[in-house]
Amino acid sequence: MRLKYLFKIQNIIDNEIRRICQEDGSVIDRVYLIKTQILALEVKTGELANITKCYKYPQQMKAVEKRKLIIRYVDCFKFLLSIGNDNQFNVVNFSVKELIESVTKEPCETIVDVFLSLFDHISNLKRDLVTENYISGMGVYMTIFKEFVLIGQLLGLTFEDVFEYYDNIYRDMVHKAEPPAER
């Protein structure tokens, strides 16, 4: 499944970052890591909202170059995947196709509504992870994931766009980290 591949790529990236931090003698405590990941996700999500200018009143959203949107979207997505990996939410076997279909069937909200809901849910996720309430956290994580899919749709992005961009940027890193195939 392609989503599992993205979780795998992000795990390789995160492990390399941790390796470098350990060489520096840095020790990262669990709660600090959660808080920094959540803050990074909020900042990157804010940058995505900013590039769309969806918050400007009474302007209509102006078209933004698709590549810029994908770059900002993937910046958010990386932190979402990292949080999933670090809290074992990556084991949930959900199909991107089913996720997209469920988002499409829901009543259409404005992008502003989705961003606001997303920020609320990100805060809820922080609370659940810091207090080690992983069952609630898993549900909130799935909601956040769904909201990211919806934002992508509202911006005209497909999962294919996101996958291709992510894969093109990080493919070499993954292949270097994988052990050679056995014969």
Mark where each language-model region is.
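Flexible "arm" and connector segments at domain edges
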Residues: 1-183
